[in-house]
Amino acid sequence: VPSNTLDQLLVQLDELKRDFDRNSRARILKILAQLERRRFADADSLSRFHETLLFIRAYPPSAQILRRVEKILSSFSTRVETLSEAGADLSPLENVEISGVSGTFVEDTFSYSITRWLVLRHPSQVSIDWEAHEDEYRLAATWPRFLPLLEEDALVEANVPYLDWLHAAKGRGLRDLGWLIERFERLPLAEKEKAELYESLKLYVRWELGDSRATRTLMKRPVRKIFYHTKPLLRRSDVSLAREFAEPSIPLQRLSRSQGEAVLNLARETSTMRYRELYGFTHGDARRVFRADIGRGVEVFLMGVPPDRRLPLRAYHAGLIFKNGVPACYVEGLSLFERMEIGFNIYYTFREGESAWIYARVLKIFRQLLGVTTFSIDPYQLGYENEEGIESGAFWFYRKLGFRPTLARVVKMMKAEERKLAARPTSRTPARILRQLSEGHMLLEIPPAFRSRWDKFQIRNVGLAVQRRMASRFDGDAVKIRRASVESVTRALGVRTKDWSENEGRALEDLALVLALIPDLARWTKDEKRDIVRIVCAKAGTAESRYLRLLQRHSRLRDAIIKLGS
Protein backbone atom coordinates (compact mmCIF):
# COMPACT_ATOMS: atom_id res chain seq x y z
CA VAL A 1 0.00 0.00 0.00
CA PRO A 2 1.72 3.21 -1.13
CA SER A 3 0.30 5.42 1.61
CA ASN A 4 -0.92 4.65 5.09
CA THR A 5 -2.62 7.85 6.22
CA LEU A 6 -6.07 7.10 7.62
CA ASP A 7 -7.97 9.00 4.94
CA GLN A 8 -6.03 7.40 2.10
CA LEU A 9 -6.52 3.93 3.54
CA LEU A 10 -10.27 4.53 3.74
CA VAL A 11 -10.37 5.83 0.16
CA GLN A 12 -8.40 2.82 -1.09
CA LEU A 13 -10.63 0.37 0.76
CA ASP A 14 -13.75 2.02 -0.66
CA GLU A 15 -12.32 1.85 -4.19
CA LEU A 16 -11.36 -1.81 -3.79
CA LYS A 17 -14.67 -3.02 -2.34
CA ARG A 18 -16.06 -3.70 -5.85
CA ASP A 19 -12.89 -5.31 -7.22
CA PHE A 20 -12.76 -9.08 -6.89
CA ASP A 21 -9.52 -10.24 -8.51
CA ARG A 22 -6.80 -12.00 -6.49
CA ASN A 23 -4.56 -8.92 -6.30
CA SER A 24 -7.41 -6.78 -4.97
CA ARG A 25 -8.26 -9.38 -2.34
CA ALA A 26 -4.69 -9.30 -1.06
CA ARG A 27 -4.71 -5.50 -0.92
CA ILE A 28 -8.04 -5.47 0.93
CA LEU A 29 -6.66 -7.82 3.59
CA LYS A 30 -3.58 -5.66 4.01
CA ILE A 31 -5.61 -2.46 4.35
CA LEU A 32 -8.04 -4.09 6.78
CA ALA A 33 -5.12 -5.18 8.96
CA GLN A 34 -3.79 -1.62 9.03
CA LEU A 35 -7.17 -0.03 9.74
CA GLU A 36 -7.99 -2.56 12.46
CA ARG A 37 -4.97 -1.31 14.42
CA ARG A 38 -5.83 2.35 13.92
CA ARG A 39 -7.32 4.55 16.59
CA PHE A 40 -10.04 6.70 15.01
CA ALA A 41 -10.17 10.27 16.26
CA ASP A 42 -13.44 11.39 14.65
CA ALA A 43 -16.87 9.95 13.95
CA ASP A 44 -16.81 10.80 10.24
CA SER A 45 -13.84 8.54 9.56
CA LEU A 46 -15.27 5.78 11.74
CA SER A 47 -18.62 5.90 9.92
CA ARG A 48 -16.88 5.73 6.52
CA PHE A 49 -15.02 2.64 7.70
CA HIS A 50 -18.22 1.13 9.08
CA GLU A 51 -20.19 1.54 5.84
CA THR A 52 -17.42 0.08 3.68
CA LEU A 53 -17.15 -2.90 6.02
CA LEU A 54 -20.89 -3.51 5.75
CA PHE A 55 -20.71 -3.45 1.96
CA ILE A 56 -17.88 -5.99 1.97
CA ARG A 57 -19.85 -8.11 4.43
CA ALA A 58 -22.75 -8.24 1.97
CA TYR A 59 -20.51 -8.64 -1.11
CA PRO A 60 -17.49 -10.57 0.25
CA PRO A 61 -14.70 -11.63 -2.14
CA SER A 62 -13.44 -14.43 0.13
CA ALA A 63 -14.07 -16.25 3.41
CA GLN A 64 -10.85 -14.85 4.86
CA ILE A 65 -11.90 -11.27 4.17
CA LEU A 66 -15.40 -11.91 5.54
CA ARG A 67 -13.98 -13.27 8.81
CA ARG A 68 -11.72 -10.24 9.18
CA VAL A 69 -14.58 -7.83 8.45
CA GLU A 70 -16.86 -9.45 11.03
CA LYS A 71 -14.09 -9.39 13.62
CA ILE A 72 -13.59 -5.65 13.08
CA LEU A 73 -17.34 -4.96 13.15
CA SER A 74 -17.58 -6.68 16.54
CA SER A 75 -15.24 -4.00 17.95
CA PHE A 76 -17.37 -1.00 16.97
CA SER A 77 -19.18 -0.55 20.26
CA THR A 78 -15.78 -0.18 21.95
CA ARG A 79 -14.57 2.17 19.21
CA VAL A 80 -17.62 4.41 19.65
CA GLU A 81 -17.16 4.40 23.43
CA THR A 82 -13.51 5.42 22.99
CA LEU A 83 -14.56 8.35 20.80
CA SER A 84 -17.19 9.40 23.33
CA GLU A 85 -14.72 9.30 26.23
CA ALA A 86 -12.35 11.47 24.19
CA GLY A 87 -15.07 14.10 23.81
CA ALA A 88 -15.44 13.64 20.05
CA ASP A 89 -18.53 14.86 18.24
CA LEU A 90 -20.67 11.76 17.64
CA SER A 91 -23.44 13.52 15.72
CA PRO A 92 -22.27 12.15 12.32
CA LEU A 93 -23.28 8.70 13.60
CA GLU A 94 -26.83 9.98 14.13
CA ASN A 95 -27.33 10.76 10.42
CA VAL A 96 -30.47 8.97 9.20
CA GLU A 97 -28.52 7.19 6.45
CA ILE A 98 -25.96 5.66 8.82
CA SER A 99 -27.75 5.49 12.18
CA GLY A 100 -27.89 2.15 13.98
CA VAL A 101 -24.16 1.69 14.66
CA SER A 102 -23.20 -0.39 17.71
CA GLY A 103 -22.65 1.77 20.78
CA THR A 104 -25.02 4.53 19.64
CA PHE A 105 -28.74 5.20 20.08
CA VAL A 106 -31.78 6.16 18.04
CA GLU A 107 -34.43 8.50 19.41
CA ASP A 108 -37.75 9.49 17.91
CA THR A 109 -41.49 9.81 18.51
CA PHE A 110 -42.15 6.28 17.34
CA SER A 111 -45.67 5.06 16.63
CA TYR A 112 -47.65 3.31 19.34
CA SER A 113 -47.27 -0.05 17.60
CA ILE A 114 -43.50 0.24 17.30
CA THR A 115 -43.08 1.61 20.83
CA ARG A 116 -45.12 -1.25 22.26
CA TRP A 117 -43.06 -3.72 20.21
CA LEU A 118 -39.80 -2.14 21.44
CA VAL A 119 -40.96 -2.47 25.05
CA LEU A 120 -41.67 -6.16 24.50
CA ARG A 121 -38.59 -6.88 22.39
CA HIS A 122 -35.93 -4.66 24.02
CA PRO A 123 -37.38 -3.68 27.43
CA SER A 124 -34.11 -2.76 29.15
CA GLN A 125 -32.82 -0.69 26.22
CA VAL A 126 -35.72 1.72 25.65
CA SER A 127 -36.75 4.71 27.74
CA ILE A 128 -38.51 8.07 27.49
CA ASP A 129 -36.33 11.14 27.01
CA TRP A 130 -38.30 13.48 29.27
CA GLU A 131 -35.95 16.39 28.59
CA ALA A 132 -37.00 16.35 24.95
CA HIS A 133 -40.74 16.42 25.76
CA GLU A 134 -42.38 19.81 25.29
CA ASP A 135 -46.18 19.46 25.29
CA GLU A 136 -47.32 19.16 28.92
CA TYR A 137 -50.87 20.07 27.93
CA ARG A 138 -51.20 16.68 26.26
CA LEU A 139 -50.15 14.97 29.51
CA ALA A 140 -52.86 16.92 31.32
CA ALA A 141 -55.45 15.76 28.80
CA THR A 142 -54.40 12.11 28.73
CA TRP A 143 -52.86 10.95 31.99
CA PRO A 144 -55.94 11.41 34.23
CA ARG A 145 -57.25 8.23 32.58
CA PHE A 146 -54.82 6.23 34.69
CA LEU A 147 -53.59 8.68 37.38
CA PRO A 148 -56.54 9.30 39.76
CA LEU A 149 -56.99 12.91 40.97
CA LEU A 150 -54.37 14.30 38.55
CA GLU A 151 -57.04 16.74 37.32
CA GLU A 152 -56.90 18.44 40.73
CA ASP A 153 -53.37 19.54 39.85
CA ALA A 154 -53.25 19.58 36.05
CA LEU A 155 -56.41 21.59 35.32
CA VAL A 156 -55.67 24.59 37.54
CA GLU A 157 -52.01 24.65 38.61
CA ALA A 158 -48.90 25.86 36.80
CA ASN A 159 -45.67 23.83 36.70
CA VAL A 160 -47.34 20.51 37.46
CA PRO A 161 -44.73 17.86 38.47
CA TYR A 162 -46.05 15.19 36.11
CA LEU A 163 -43.11 12.86 36.69
CA ASP A 164 -43.73 12.95 40.45
CA TRP A 165 -47.28 11.78 39.79
CA LEU A 166 -46.05 9.09 37.41
CA HIS A 167 -43.35 7.77 39.73
CA ALA A 168 -45.69 7.73 42.72
CA ALA A 169 -48.20 5.67 40.74
CA LYS A 170 -45.87 3.13 39.18
CA GLY A 171 -43.81 2.31 42.25
CA ARG A 172 -40.21 1.13 42.31
CA GLY A 173 -38.53 -1.26 39.93
CA LEU A 174 -40.67 -0.41 36.92
CA ARG A 175 -39.57 1.66 33.93
CA ASP A 176 -41.63 4.70 32.93
CA LEU A 177 -42.19 3.60 29.35
CA GLY A 178 -43.17 0.02 30.12
CA TRP A 179 -45.62 1.15 32.81
CA LEU A 180 -47.24 3.71 30.50
CA ILE A 181 -47.59 1.27 27.61
CA GLU A 182 -49.25 -1.23 29.95
CA ARG A 183 -51.73 1.47 31.03
CA PHE A 184 -52.59 2.27 27.41
CA GLU A 185 -53.06 -1.42 26.68
CA ARG A 186 -55.63 -1.64 29.51
CA LEU A 187 -57.75 1.26 28.23
CA PRO A 188 -61.22 0.13 27.03
CA LEU A 189 -60.58 1.54 23.56
CA ALA A 190 -60.14 0.16 20.07
CA GLU A 191 -56.56 -0.39 18.92
CA LYS A 192 -56.58 2.61 16.58
CA GLU A 193 -57.94 4.88 19.32
CA LYS A 194 -55.20 3.79 21.73
CA ALA A 195 -52.62 4.56 19.06
CA GLU A 196 -54.07 8.01 18.36
CA LEU A 197 -54.14 8.83 22.08
CA TYR A 198 -50.56 7.66 22.72
CA GLU A 199 -49.15 9.35 19.62
CA SER A 200 -50.78 12.66 20.59
CA LEU A 201 -48.33 12.79 23.54
CA LYS A 202 -45.34 13.01 21.15
CA LEU A 203 -43.06 11.16 23.59
CA TYR A 204 -39.44 10.83 22.48
CA VAL A 205 -38.31 7.25 23.00
CA ARG A 206 -34.59 6.46 23.12
CA TRP A 207 -33.31 3.05 22.09
CA GLU A 208 -29.80 2.44 23.45
CA LEU A 209 -28.34 -0.02 20.97
CA GLY A 210 -25.20 -1.12 22.80
CA ASP A 211 -23.84 -4.37 21.35
CA SER A 212 -27.29 -5.64 20.40
CA ARG A 213 -27.59 -8.01 17.46
CA ALA A 214 -30.28 -5.62 16.26
CA THR A 215 -27.73 -2.96 15.28
CA ARG A 216 -26.83 -2.42 11.65
CA THR A 217 -23.29 -3.29 12.70
CA LEU A 218 -24.14 -6.78 13.92
CA MET A 219 -27.48 -7.66 12.34
CA LYS A 220 -27.12 -10.69 10.13
CA ARG A 221 -29.55 -13.45 9.35
CA PRO A 222 -28.02 -16.97 9.50
CA VAL A 223 -27.48 -18.35 5.99
CA ARG A 224 -26.58 -21.84 4.85
CA LYS A 225 -24.08 -20.76 2.22
CA ILE A 226 -22.29 -17.47 1.56
CA PHE A 227 -22.05 -16.30 -2.05
CA TYR A 228 -18.49 -15.08 -2.59
CA HIS A 229 -17.91 -12.60 -5.42
CA THR A 230 -14.95 -13.46 -7.63
CA LYS A 231 -16.17 -11.70 -10.80
CA PRO A 232 -17.43 -8.15 -11.50
CA LEU A 233 -20.83 -7.26 -10.05
CA LEU A 234 -23.85 -7.38 -12.33
CA ARG A 235 -24.52 -3.93 -13.76
CA ARG A 236 -27.78 -2.46 -14.98
CA SER A 237 -26.69 -3.09 -18.58
CA ASP A 238 -26.44 -6.81 -17.72
CA VAL A 239 -30.11 -6.92 -16.73
CA SER A 240 -33.02 -7.57 -19.09
CA LEU A 241 -36.52 -7.53 -17.61
CA ALA A 242 -37.84 -9.44 -20.62
CA ARG A 243 -35.28 -12.16 -20.01
CA GLU A 244 -36.07 -12.28 -16.29
CA PHE A 245 -39.81 -12.67 -16.90
CA ALA A 246 -39.13 -15.45 -19.41
CA GLU A 247 -37.11 -17.45 -16.87
CA PRO A 248 -38.71 -20.37 -14.97
CA SER A 249 -40.71 -19.54 -11.84
CA ILE A 250 -38.79 -18.81 -8.66
CA PRO A 251 -39.67 -21.33 -5.89
CA LEU A 252 -41.54 -19.71 -3.00
CA GLN A 253 -41.60 -21.15 0.52
CA ARG A 254 -44.30 -20.14 3.00
CA LEU A 255 -42.79 -19.83 6.47
CA SER A 256 -44.28 -21.09 9.71
CA ARG A 257 -45.84 -18.47 11.96
CA SER A 258 -42.82 -18.44 14.31
CA GLN A 259 -40.42 -18.12 11.37
CA GLY A 260 -42.56 -15.33 9.94
CA GLU A 261 -42.54 -13.49 13.27
CA ALA A 262 -38.74 -13.75 13.41
CA VAL A 263 -38.47 -12.16 9.95
CA LEU A 264 -40.91 -9.40 10.93
CA ASN A 265 -38.85 -8.66 14.05
CA LEU A 266 -35.74 -8.27 11.88
CA ALA A 267 -37.69 -6.03 9.50
CA ARG A 268 -38.92 -3.79 12.34
CA GLU A 269 -35.45 -3.57 13.84
CA THR A 270 -33.70 -2.72 10.60
CA SER A 271 -36.30 -0.03 9.82
CA THR A 272 -36.60 1.50 13.28
CA MET A 273 -32.86 1.99 13.70
CA ARG A 274 -32.90 3.87 10.37
CA TYR A 275 -35.72 6.17 11.55
CA ARG A 276 -38.11 4.55 9.09
CA GLU A 277 -41.37 2.75 9.60
CA LEU A 278 -42.96 0.63 6.90
CA TYR A 279 -46.62 -0.23 7.31
CA GLY A 280 -46.13 -3.83 6.24
CA PHE A 281 -43.30 -4.40 8.71
CA THR A 282 -45.13 -2.80 11.64
CA HIS A 283 -48.40 -4.64 10.97
CA GLY A 284 -47.20 -7.62 8.93
CA ASP A 285 -49.06 -10.94 9.06
CA ALA A 286 -46.63 -13.55 10.44
CA ARG A 287 -48.84 -16.29 8.97
CA ARG A 288 -48.33 -15.01 5.42
CA VAL A 289 -44.57 -14.57 5.03
CA PHE A 290 -42.93 -16.08 1.96
CA ARG A 291 -39.25 -16.69 1.29
CA ALA A 292 -37.55 -16.84 -2.10
CA ASP A 293 -33.90 -17.64 -2.75
CA ILE A 294 -33.21 -15.70 -5.96
CA GLY A 295 -29.54 -16.63 -6.24
CA ARG A 296 -26.20 -14.86 -5.69
CA GLY A 297 -26.73 -14.92 -1.91
CA VAL A 298 -29.99 -12.97 -2.03
CA GLU A 299 -33.10 -13.91 -0.04
CA VAL A 300 -36.41 -12.11 -0.51
CA PHE A 301 -39.07 -12.18 2.22
CA LEU A 302 -42.54 -10.97 1.26
CA MET A 303 -45.43 -10.42 3.64
CA GLY A 304 -49.01 -9.18 3.59
CA VAL A 305 -51.07 -7.67 6.40
CA PRO A 306 -53.96 -9.29 8.34
CA PRO A 307 -57.58 -8.48 7.38
CA ASP A 308 -58.09 -5.87 10.11
CA ARG A 309 -55.05 -3.89 8.90
CA ARG A 310 -55.72 -3.89 5.16
CA LEU A 311 -56.16 -0.87 2.94
CA PRO A 312 -59.74 -0.20 1.79
CA LEU A 313 -59.11 -0.85 -1.92
CA ARG A 314 -55.56 -1.85 -2.80
CA ALA A 315 -53.84 -5.07 -1.76
CA TYR A 316 -50.73 -4.41 0.33
CA HIS A 317 -47.45 -6.33 0.31
CA ALA A 318 -44.02 -5.50 1.68
CA GLY A 319 -40.66 -7.18 1.39
CA LEU A 320 -37.24 -7.23 3.02
CA ILE A 321 -34.25 -8.37 0.98
CA PHE A 322 -31.08 -9.85 2.49
CA LYS A 323 -27.73 -10.13 0.74
CA ASN A 324 -25.62 -12.88 2.33
CA GLY A 325 -27.73 -12.43 5.47
CA VAL A 326 -27.36 -8.63 5.58
CA PRO A 327 -30.51 -6.46 5.17
CA ALA A 328 -29.83 -4.59 1.92
CA CYS A 329 -33.14 -3.21 0.66
CA TYR A 330 -36.90 -3.22 1.08
CA VAL A 331 -39.91 -3.03 -1.21
CA GLU A 332 -43.56 -2.03 -0.93
CA GLY A 333 -46.29 -2.98 -3.40
CA LEU A 334 -49.82 -1.54 -3.59
CA SER A 335 -51.95 -3.45 -6.08
CA LEU A 336 -55.34 -3.08 -7.73
CA PHE A 337 -56.34 -5.50 -10.49
CA GLU A 338 -53.12 -6.10 -12.48
CA ARG A 339 -51.56 -2.72 -11.60
CA MET A 340 -48.98 -2.45 -8.80
CA GLU A 341 -47.52 0.77 -7.46
CA ILE A 342 -44.07 -0.34 -6.39
CA GLY A 343 -41.54 1.40 -4.18
CA PHE A 344 -38.08 -0.16 -4.10
CA ASN A 345 -35.45 1.22 -1.73
CA ILE A 346 -31.82 0.18 -1.51
CA TYR A 347 -30.26 1.06 1.83
CA TYR A 348 -27.64 3.77 1.35
CA THR A 349 -24.66 1.53 2.09
CA PHE A 350 -25.48 -0.96 -0.67
CA ARG A 351 -26.37 1.31 -3.60
CA GLU A 352 -23.20 0.34 -5.46
CA GLY A 353 -24.23 -3.31 -5.40
CA GLU A 354 -26.37 -5.36 -7.77
CA SER A 355 -29.47 -3.17 -7.41
CA ALA A 356 -30.90 -3.53 -10.92
CA TRP A 357 -30.64 -7.33 -10.92
CA ILE A 358 -32.27 -7.62 -7.48
CA TYR A 359 -35.04 -5.24 -8.58
CA ALA A 360 -35.73 -7.31 -11.70
CA ARG A 361 -35.98 -10.51 -9.65
CA VAL A 362 -38.35 -8.86 -7.16
CA LEU A 363 -40.65 -7.75 -10.00
CA LYS A 364 -40.67 -11.32 -11.27
CA ILE A 365 -41.70 -12.63 -7.84
CA PHE A 366 -44.56 -10.13 -7.58
CA ARG A 367 -45.70 -11.06 -11.09
CA GLN A 368 -45.59 -14.72 -10.12
CA LEU A 369 -47.27 -14.40 -6.70
CA LEU A 370 -49.93 -11.78 -7.45
CA GLY A 371 -50.52 -11.86 -11.20
CA VAL A 372 -49.64 -8.16 -11.64
CA THR A 373 -48.51 -7.11 -15.12
CA THR A 374 -48.36 -3.31 -14.89
CA PHE A 375 -45.84 -1.71 -12.55
CA SER A 376 -46.13 1.98 -11.65
CA ILE A 377 -43.41 4.20 -10.20
CA ASP A 378 -44.53 7.17 -8.10
CA PRO A 379 -43.01 10.58 -9.02
CA TYR A 380 -41.36 10.80 -5.59
CA GLN A 381 -39.34 7.66 -6.36
CA LEU A 382 -38.16 9.37 -9.54
CA GLY A 383 -37.04 12.54 -7.75
CA TYR A 384 -40.15 14.71 -7.49
CA GLU A 385 -39.57 16.78 -4.33
CA ASN A 386 -36.87 14.22 -3.52
CA GLU A 387 -33.31 15.44 -4.07
CA GLU A 388 -31.90 12.01 -3.34
CA GLY A 389 -33.75 10.68 -6.39
CA ILE A 390 -32.40 13.54 -8.51
CA GLU A 391 -28.81 12.97 -7.38
CA SER A 392 -29.01 9.24 -8.12
CA GLY A 393 -30.57 9.77 -11.56
CA ALA A 394 -33.50 7.53 -10.60
CA PHE A 395 -35.48 8.46 -13.72
CA TRP A 396 -32.83 6.96 -16.00
CA PHE A 397 -32.46 3.87 -13.79
CA TYR A 398 -36.09 3.00 -14.46
CA ARG A 399 -36.12 4.22 -18.05
CA LYS A 400 -33.19 1.98 -19.00
CA LEU A 401 -35.00 -0.99 -17.47
CA GLY A 402 -37.95 -0.36 -19.79
CA PHE A 403 -40.31 1.93 -17.86
CA ARG A 404 -41.99 4.77 -19.77
CA PRO A 405 -43.44 8.10 -18.59
CA THR A 406 -47.19 8.61 -18.90
CA LEU A 407 -47.39 12.41 -19.27
CA ALA A 408 -47.12 13.62 -22.87
CA ARG A 409 -44.93 16.61 -21.98
CA VAL A 410 -42.54 14.35 -20.05
CA VAL A 411 -42.37 11.94 -23.01
CA LYS A 412 -41.47 14.83 -25.32
CA MET A 413 -38.77 16.10 -22.95
CA MET A 414 -37.40 12.58 -22.41
CA LYS A 415 -37.04 11.94 -26.15
CA ALA A 416 -35.20 15.23 -26.61
CA GLU A 417 -32.87 14.39 -23.73
CA GLU A 418 -32.27 10.88 -25.08
CA ARG A 419 -31.19 12.39 -28.41
CA LYS A 420 -28.75 14.70 -26.60
CA LEU A 421 -27.28 11.83 -24.59
CA ALA A 422 -26.93 9.70 -27.72
CA ALA A 423 -24.94 12.49 -29.37
CA ARG A 424 -22.82 13.08 -26.25
CA PRO A 425 -22.62 9.76 -24.35
CA THR A 426 -20.41 11.15 -21.57
CA SER A 427 -22.76 14.03 -20.71
CA ARG A 428 -25.19 14.01 -17.77
CA THR A 429 -28.76 15.24 -17.56
CA PRO A 430 -28.91 18.51 -15.55
CA ALA A 431 -30.79 18.39 -12.25
CA ARG A 432 -33.25 20.97 -13.61
CA ILE A 433 -34.27 18.60 -16.41
CA LEU A 434 -34.42 15.59 -14.06
CA ARG A 435 -36.86 17.47 -11.83
CA GLN A 436 -39.18 18.02 -14.78
CA LEU A 437 -38.84 14.42 -15.94
CA SER A 438 -39.89 13.24 -12.47
CA GLU A 439 -43.23 15.06 -12.46
CA GLY A 440 -45.33 12.10 -13.60
CA HIS A 441 -45.63 8.36 -13.06
CA MET A 442 -43.68 5.80 -15.06
CA LEU A 443 -45.19 2.47 -16.11
CA LEU A 444 -43.85 -0.90 -17.15
CA GLU A 445 -46.30 -3.22 -18.92
CA ILE A 446 -45.59 -6.93 -19.22
CA PRO A 447 -47.57 -9.04 -21.70
CA PRO A 448 -50.49 -9.68 -21.58
CA ALA A 449 -50.97 -6.18 -20.12
CA PHE A 450 -52.75 -3.66 -22.37
CA ARG A 451 -50.55 -0.67 -23.14
CA SER A 452 -51.79 2.70 -21.86
CA ARG A 453 -54.83 1.24 -20.04
CA TRP A 454 -53.64 2.63 -16.69
CA ASP A 455 -51.85 5.77 -17.94
CA LYS A 456 -54.19 8.32 -16.36
CA PHE A 457 -55.33 6.31 -13.35
CA GLN A 458 -54.66 7.49 -9.79
CA ILE A 459 -56.25 5.81 -6.79
CA ARG A 460 -56.63 9.22 -5.14
CA ASN A 461 -59.13 10.24 -7.83
CA VAL A 462 -61.43 7.43 -6.71
CA GLY A 463 -61.27 8.68 -3.12
CA LEU A 464 -61.95 12.26 -4.19
CA ALA A 465 -65.00 11.13 -6.17
CA VAL A 466 -66.36 9.56 -2.97
CA GLN A 467 -65.77 12.84 -1.09
CA ARG A 468 -67.66 14.83 -3.73
CA ARG A 469 -70.60 12.44 -3.50
CA MET A 470 -70.55 12.70 0.29
CA ALA A 471 -70.57 16.51 0.10
CA SER A 472 -73.34 16.77 -2.48
CA ARG A 473 -75.71 14.05 -1.28
CA PHE A 474 -74.95 13.40 2.39
CA ASP A 475 -74.08 16.83 3.77
CA GLY A 476 -70.50 15.73 4.44
CA ASP A 477 -71.62 12.97 6.84
CA ALA A 478 -69.31 9.93 6.62
CA VAL A 479 -71.65 7.71 8.65
CA LYS A 480 -74.58 8.43 6.33
CA ILE A 481 -72.68 7.78 3.10
CA ARG A 482 -71.29 4.51 4.44
CA ARG A 483 -74.70 3.27 5.52
CA ALA A 484 -76.40 4.36 2.30
CA SER A 485 -73.65 2.88 0.11
CA VAL A 486 -73.88 -0.52 1.79
CA GLU A 487 -77.67 -0.51 1.46
CA SER A 488 -77.68 0.46 -2.22
CA VAL A 489 -74.86 -1.91 -3.19
CA THR A 490 -76.24 -4.97 -1.38
CA ARG A 491 -79.62 -4.26 -2.96
CA ALA A 492 -78.06 -3.93 -6.43
CA LEU A 493 -76.06 -7.14 -5.96
CA GLY A 494 -78.96 -9.02 -4.40
CA VAL A 495 -76.87 -10.21 -1.48
CA ARG A 496 -77.67 -10.72 2.22
CA THR A 497 -74.85 -10.15 4.69
CA LYS A 498 -76.45 -11.34 7.94
CA ASP A 499 -73.96 -14.20 8.34
CA TRP A 500 -70.87 -12.30 7.19
CA SER A 501 -67.85 -11.97 9.48
CA GLU A 502 -66.71 -8.67 10.97
CA ASN A 503 -63.82 -8.47 8.48
CA GLU A 504 -66.15 -9.16 5.54
CA GLY A 505 -68.49 -6.45 6.79
CA ARG A 506 -65.60 -3.99 7.00
CA ALA A 507 -64.48 -4.87 3.47
CA LEU A 508 -68.03 -4.37 2.19
CA GLU A 509 -68.28 -0.96 3.89
CA ASP A 510 -65.11 0.22 2.16
CA LEU A 511 -65.71 -1.26 -1.28
CA ALA A 512 -69.38 -0.21 -1.28
CA LEU A 513 -68.30 3.45 -1.24
CA VAL A 514 -66.73 2.88 -4.67
CA LEU A 515 -69.26 0.41 -6.07
CA ALA A 516 -72.02 2.93 -5.29
CA LEU A 517 -70.40 5.30 -7.80
CA ILE A 518 -71.12 2.86 -10.66
CA PRO A 519 -74.45 4.11 -12.07
CA ASP A 520 -75.58 0.92 -13.80
CA LEU A 521 -74.43 -1.62 -11.21
CA ALA A 522 -77.95 -2.98 -10.69
CA ARG A 523 -78.16 -3.85 -14.41
CA TRP A 524 -74.98 -5.96 -14.48
CA THR A 525 -75.37 -9.66 -15.19
CA LYS A 526 -75.99 -12.20 -12.47
CA ASP A 527 -72.48 -13.65 -12.94
CA GLU A 528 -70.85 -10.21 -12.77
CA LYS A 529 -72.68 -9.45 -9.52
CA ARG A 530 -71.81 -12.84 -8.03
CA ASP A 531 -68.15 -12.26 -8.84
CA ILE A 532 -68.21 -8.86 -7.10
CA VAL A 533 -69.52 -10.55 -3.94
CA ARG A 534 -66.66 -13.05 -4.16
CA ILE A 535 -64.20 -10.16 -4.55
CA VAL A 536 -65.55 -8.40 -1.44
CA CYS A 537 -65.26 -11.57 0.64
CA ALA A 538 -61.75 -12.25 -0.69
CA LYS A 539 -60.65 -8.78 0.47
CA ALA A 540 -61.28 -10.07 4.00
CA GLY A 541 -59.83 -13.51 3.34
CA THR A 542 -56.57 -15.07 4.49
CA ALA A 543 -54.52 -13.78 1.53
CA GLU A 544 -55.03 -10.71 -0.64
CA SER A 545 -53.49 -12.56 -3.57
CA ARG A 546 -56.88 -14.23 -4.11
CA TYR A 547 -58.59 -10.81 -4.01
CA LEU A 548 -56.27 -9.62 -6.78
CA ARG A 549 -56.74 -12.72 -8.92
CA LEU A 550 -60.52 -12.33 -8.75
CA LEU A 551 -60.27 -8.63 -9.62
CA GLN A 552 -58.09 -9.44 -12.61
CA ARG A 553 -60.84 -11.69 -14.03
CA HIS A 554 -63.58 -9.05 -13.76
CA SER A 555 -63.16 -6.94 -16.90
CA ARG A 556 -66.32 -4.87 -16.44
CA LEU A 557 -65.41 -3.87 -12.90
CA ARG A 558 -61.87 -3.00 -14.07
CA ASP A 559 -63.24 -0.68 -16.76
CA ALA A 560 -65.54 1.04 -14.25
CA ILE A 561 -62.79 1.58 -11.67
CA ILE A 562 -60.31 2.87 -14.26
CA LYS A 563 -62.95 5.35 -15.46
CA LEU A 564 -63.52 6.57 -11.88
CA GLY A 565 -59.78 6.95 -11.26
CA SER A 566 -58.85 8.60 -14.53
Which positions does each model-derived feature cover?
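Glycine-centered secondary-structure boundary/capping sites
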Residues: 1, 315, 351-354, 494
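Long, compositionally biased intrinsically disordered regions
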Residues: 2-149, 159, 424-566
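Hydrophobic transmembrane signal anchors and adjacent membrane-proximal interface regions, especially
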Residues: 98, 128, 182, 203, ...
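Long, charge-dense tracts
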Residues: 116-267, 272
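Acyl-donor binding region in acyl/amide transferases
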Residues: 132-135, 139-157, 161-173, 179-183, ...
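A conserved beta-strand-loop-helix scaffold within acyl/acetyltransferase catalytic domains
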Residues: 248-351, 360, 364-370, 503, ...
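Charge-rich, low-complexity amphipathic helices
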Residues: 388-389, 419-421, 426-427
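Extended amphipathic alpha-helical segments with heptad-repeat/coiled-coil character used for oligomerization
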Residues: 413-422, 434-435
